[in-house]
């Protein structure tokens, strides 16, 4: 169905809060997943990303969820449907059009970097 989601993941430690973002793209049986330390904004250049293990499809529909074993709180901050414009869709190279409120435009992941630009 080509769904995607951007999740804010807060891990509350004894003295500090670690915040990162998980970006999930639906694949047939699960979701390709990347970790961002900052949200890639439109036309602001390249942002570093880290490939994560694939996540279950259930994360595409969760709005907020408290993880077990003090692993933090996950909250959906953007989501939508994507259009794949690359010849392939895999975890190392991705070129899709996003239609979210925050992430809207041509989104490219190439290795450890991503970029969001205006969709022409």
Feature annotation, model-predicted:
Residues 1-120:
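A charge-rich, low-complexity, intrinsically flexible signal that marks solvent-exposed coils, linkers
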């Amino acid at each position: 169905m080509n769904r995607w989601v951007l999740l804010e993941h807060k891990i509350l430690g004894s003295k500090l809060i670690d915040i990162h973002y998980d970006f999930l793209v639906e694949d047939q049986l699960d979701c390709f997943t990347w970790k961002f330390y900052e949200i890639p904004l439109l036309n602001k250049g390249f942002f570093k990303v880290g490939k994560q293990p694939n996540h279950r499809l259930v994360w595409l529909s969760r709005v907020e969820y408290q993880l077990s074993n003090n692993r933090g709180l996950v909250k959906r901050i953007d989501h939508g449907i994507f259009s794949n414009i690359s010849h392939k869709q895999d975890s190392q190279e991705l070129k899709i059009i996003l239609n979210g409120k925050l992430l809207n435009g041509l989104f490219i992941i190439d290795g450890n970097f991503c970029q969001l630009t205006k969709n022409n």
